[in-house]
Amino acid sequence: MKFGVIVFPGSNCDHDAYHVISKHVGQPVDFIWHRDTDLSSYDAVIIPGGFSYGDYLRAGALARFSPVMNSVKAFAASGNLVLGICNGFQILCEAGLLPGALIRNRDLHFVCDYVNVRVENTDTPFTHELKAGSALQMPIAHAEGNYVCDDATFAELQGQGRIIFRYCDRNGETTDAANPNGSRDNIAGICNRERNVLGLMPHPERACEDLLGSSDGRELFRSLAGTLAAAA
């Protein structure tokens, strides 16, 4: 199996994702420049966090027009796995690969902190090695992480089990106090209908080593690799 990490001007978590895949998952991984369009040699693509194009206009609004994104759409449509983290989640929403939008945080401040997220669904390629209902500790770092969607979209996400992560307290309770940005229903991550595209605002790639305060994100990447290994 082989992973690709897309790099936009302004990406700053690309090396973190690369490090996790190469060191903790133990699989080959390449950086993919945003002007490149050939994804044929990859089994999974990661769109990392950062500030693509300086977040001008709004987060992800310009990155969606990069040449690589048409290839990402085709890659996902073929059933391949796409993971968007933080700015990557924003880009996936802007590109129409995930519904809804991520707007300014409720308090209009950039938030950089550790949060807890509850695993809502383990029936996905990204979460099958996680425990449903468990609370994972991961860092966040964003100014536009407030997930919004209309009522019909929310009902669909809820009804189809596509809300994958919710912000919670350390006991797994989804309280308002545990919601760092005002996201609807404490939503921290969602997937598409086919469940092969996942976007989340917390940074699992920054929670893979105890030295950094948490290794709770490691199993997400191992789930992803396990899915690919089973399909090989």
Enumerate the language-model features and the residues they cover.
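Active-site-proximal beta-strand elements of phosphoester/diester hydrolases
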Residues: F3-G4, Q137-A141, L198-M201
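N-terminal beta1-alpha1 cap of cysteine-dependent amidohydrolase-like domains
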Residues: M1-I85, C93-P99, N105-V111, R118, ...
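Short, glycine-/Ser/Thr-/acidic-enriched flexible segments
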Residues: G10-S11, S52, G145, R170, ...
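Beta-strand-turn-beta hairpins that frame and shape the catalytic cleft
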Residues: M1, A132-A135, N192-V197
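A glycine-centered loop/beta-turn motif at secondary-structure junctions
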Residues: I187-L211
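Pocket-forming structural segment of enzyme catalytic cores
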Residues: L97-R184
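Structured helix-beta-strand junction loops
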Residues: S78-G79, G159-G161, R193
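N-terminal Rossmann-like NAD(P)+-binding domain of SDR-like oxidoreductases, especially those catalyzing
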Residues: G88
